[in-house]
Amino acid sequence: MALYSKKTDLSSASSGGYTGVADVYQFWNYHHRGDGNIGDKPSYTLEQARDQITRGNVTWNGENVFGKPAALTYSFLQSVSDANMPDNYKGFVKFNAAQIQQARLALQSWADVANVTFTEVKNPQQATIKFGNYTLTSDGHTDNNSQAFGFYPGNWKWAGSAWFNYNQADNQRPDINEFGRNTLAHEIGHTLGLYHPGDYDASDGNPGYKDVTYAEDTRQFSIMSYWNEGYTGGDFHGYHAAGPLMDDIAAIQKLYGANMTTRTGDTVYGFHSNTDRDFYTATDSKTPLIFSVWDAGGNDTFDFSGYSSNQRISLISGTFSDVGDLKGNVSIAAGAVIENAIGGSGNDVIVGNLSDNHIDGGAGNDVLYGDGGADILTGGAGKDIFVYAWEKDSLASAPDTITDFQRGEDKIDLSAFNKNHDLQFVDHFSGAGNEVLLNWDGQANQTNMWMHLSGHSSADFLVNIVGTALQPSDFIV
């Protein structure tokens, strides 16, 4: 389903002169999926991608056993002889301290989103998941080519084990946002039953994006993918995700169920994060954030206030945001709800959802769209545009509040309602419909913007604008 399917077709409203609606309309179509082809590849819905990544139908609960929790153990191998190494690799090296620390963090990222628990045990023979390094090929030569491999769930000796080429520097130091940490999370995905999104493998020929089954097989959508996010319009500036992404979360939740105990309080992602997860946390304006958020409850906030770039922030489940000068680097997993957003000092576009959102644009010339719900909208410094595009964006029974409208600087964009150029500002409603009435409430110190769209006896639409008496010139129609 298109993200804008329930709303007015804005294509005509967004053509011609500039409107805030134009930015919102473009953002609604951002990374739209599941409808036709992208280039010569079919575009998959989230559900289709989920099923593709889980096409092996294997879990630690058995084949074709879905949605059942799993209590797993893990261990770090201490010694393996060449004769006992899997796939004829040789030259065992045990995990170093940095690898152990980062492996624990990578395991936690999977446990956060699905009903899988991981308990560390000392004896590898008692462990479900085992970690080790290799250094040599089957003929005893130093392996400078391969990266890592992992085995799916099963009942044979090395099922659920993950192996890493210790000759690769990024495997020795798998830091946040680097390929080594990404590789850890990827291989753990295999040990839990996830496949590559396409039928390719680094050990089989020289695969490329030409070999993908569907267009969204990139590292923007899935940590299980081999392919650069640029193929789907993302840009991570050479950085990498450290935990499961949107399609991975859907896939692992299919296998083991969703973890509904994860972050049920009021959680902040980005700056001032209280997640206790490094990949959800920004410490300064140079921090690259690459994540898909899973959150099981509370009143939650995207805080991207420390960035000065022009950002596009979406609070709609299943969509992407452009955060901190990257593109398509933040997403919200299906079923998760984030209620609030704080922009930075650039010219941001922020789109809310059907919850009661609190959206703060920060400095810069921002475009804010609250969508449904009783939203609180704060533009901040700069020339801001507050967009309304749907008759249910601000109901009379649950109105939005604009907290800091500045006459001569800010605008309220109603052009989506004026496609036929019949929206009128009036002193009183006539019952004809498509009328806007501005009423100054001195006691409340606000302008009440009423709209009578349908022509029946009561107003359909109300926005409260604090602190100033508005005139028709304050609107884009």
PLM region spans:
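Metzincin-family zinc-dependent endopeptidase catalytic domain
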Residues: 28-69, 98-219, 226-235, 284-288, ...
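Acidic glycine-/aspartate-rich tracts in secreted/extracellular proteins
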Residues: 79-81, 124, 135-138, 169-170, ...
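Disordered inhibitory propeptide/activation segment of secreted metzincin zinc metalloprotease zymogens
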Residues: 1-95
